């Protein structure tokens, strides 16, 4: 059995009884039932995900890690981005130096950022802190043919699965997804169009801030890519290989690995949710393990979230990526879990419950 098949086999729906038990605990806290709104939802879901009946002393709140996957895209040569692909490698170094948006917000919530070179078209050498899992030096131009081979897509999925398994062994109790890849809103729009049947125009936006003419070109390029490649919507790996990206595949794998290892995973924005969409098409139960950090201003994002069945935590008009929204949402999820852990019960506080 392959690593992917084995991982998919391990992913089961979260037990409704565990959700109910967590809610009973929350209802016994010194507050009216449900009065902490979605914080209770976050706590209930988190506790049910991470619960281990064989280990009652399991640490609920261990290490929080955002994995930021970096890769390049051949489709950039079609003029679909404001920025040259060299920005990908430059931003990787910025992440490693702690100077990017995700670094600032991760520090704010006490999370670690781990940067993964899964497909940057650049050789970094021995750079301290960089997790090197390069599958290829970027994808091919999806407008002219498949972005990658099926074997490359599988290898990138396996990178993410492996990182999640490693995280479990080292005491990580919450994962976040992030990415860096100039041009990566283009494959993300292609993925949602291929899987959902929405028109490209319905799910394609300005990415880094392109003008009207560039947006029309971007739509044309994606339509051409879908026509040339004919991805099979019933085969998520085919969609991923033909019109996806290496960092998107890594994110999908991380989500699958998180679900298989019962680790809550906070999904960032548009590109990360493209990975989540691939993961959920491979096994619908992964939805139980995901928290949608926010709803991006990218118009295709809401369609993705609806398709998976996720309700975003935040709406802050974010469109940066990197894992910025995931880092912010981690703080709110952790707040809910601390209510579950630390808030007094009626009996403990000597407060009447009725």
Curated annotation (Swiss-Prot):
GO terms for molecular function: nicotinate-nucleotide-dimethylbenzimidazole phosphoribosyltransferase activity. One of its GO terms (biological process) is cobalamin biosynthetic process. The active site is at residue 322. Coiled coil: none annotated. InterPro entries: Nict_dMeBzImd_PRibTrfase (IPR003200), Nict_dMeBzImd_PRibTrfase_bact (IPR017846), Nict_dMeBzImd_PRibTrfase_N (IPR023195), Nict_dMeBzImd_PRibTrfase_sf (IPR036087). It is an enzyme of class 2 (transferase). Keywords: Cobalamin biosynthesis, Glycosyltransferase, Transferase. Its EC number is 2.4.2.21. HAMAP family: CobT. Belongs to the CobT family. This is Nicotinate-nucleotide--dimethylbenzimidazole phosphoribosyltransferase. It comes from Geotalea daltonii (strain DSM 22248 / JCM 15807 / FRC-32) (Geobacter daltonii). The gene is cobT.
